[in-house]
Amino acid sequence: MPTLAVHGGAGRLDRRARRAEIDAALERALGAGFDAAGGGALDAAVAAVQVLEDDPLFNAGTGAVLTATGGVELDAGVMVAAGLRTGAVAGVTDFANPVELARAVMEDGRHVL
């Protein structure tokens, strides 16, 4: 049986008041992952992370914590066990879904980061 887990983050913010909203967003991420799972585990993981990156409730993408200068710097990474393939990006400032860039780095194969 396929299994997919998403992690909505950790931190000091009191999320109890928004629990239903957060749970619904996590369900959307899981749904997107399972919808994309026909393409494989990587497709499922990337689709799920994109939902989290697009939701301001999470410290990723749209909801990322701002830097000291008020900007956004995003990091992302992907890994595929078969072939020990990996790709990552760091400090991305002008791209909505850095997980897509991390995947592109991995698929290009010339670099890891």
Predicted features along the sequence, with ranges:
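Alpha/propeptide regions of enzymes that mature by internal proteolysis
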Residues: M1-L113
